[in-house]
Amino acid sequence: MGLGQGGGLAQRGTFAEGLKNDVVVVALSPGRRHLTKPVCEITYGIRESGIQTSVQVLNAGSGLPADAPNSLGSTFGLKPEEVEQVNRHKLCIIHFGNVKSHVVYKARLFLRFVTILTIVVCQTPIDMEDFAKIGIKTADVIPIEPKTKGTIVEIVTGVVRGESSPQSKIDEIIEKIKKHLK
């Protein structure tokens, strides 16, 4: 386990469990390009709204999955214990970043193992069809050949990594969480 730049907020491999296993917010490994700042603010906002929330910062959350096109450098992956920790919850919120191709391939690897409903938060404009094209199950678009166990139920775009999240985005995330926790 190494230390990464997290804006002083979190380090890779961190897992902080809430009192109830309702929601888990997942952040990529902190580093030069993946700062956990928006994830920490989102988590704080969710907790302030009265929803029990856990936090998981992935140990190998930077880079691309090995099966992604043009995958060079560091490799995105999940440890079995991270998968187990996430799957104990009812709903997952994960922030994937800004590069569209990275977002979809990371989501596919993540949801191969994570079986719970997932809300994707990212900076780049993206829709359910972008995920379904590579086999990710979504609430709105069913892929021809599903390659994931988990399902994307909502997408929130425009959340910039390393920057403060506008209250409107935090409110949007909370609204979508409440819709799926009923």
From Swiss-Prot:
One of its GO terms (biological process) is methanogenesis. InterPro entries: Me_CoM_Rdtase_prot-C, Me_CoM_Rdtase_prot-C-like. Transmembrane segments: none annotated. Keywords: Methanogenesis. MCR is composed of three subunits: alpha, beta, and gamma. The function of proteins C and D is not known. NCBIfam families: met_CoM_red_C. This is Methyl-coenzyme M reductase operon protein C. It comes from Methanococcus voltae. The gene is mcrC.
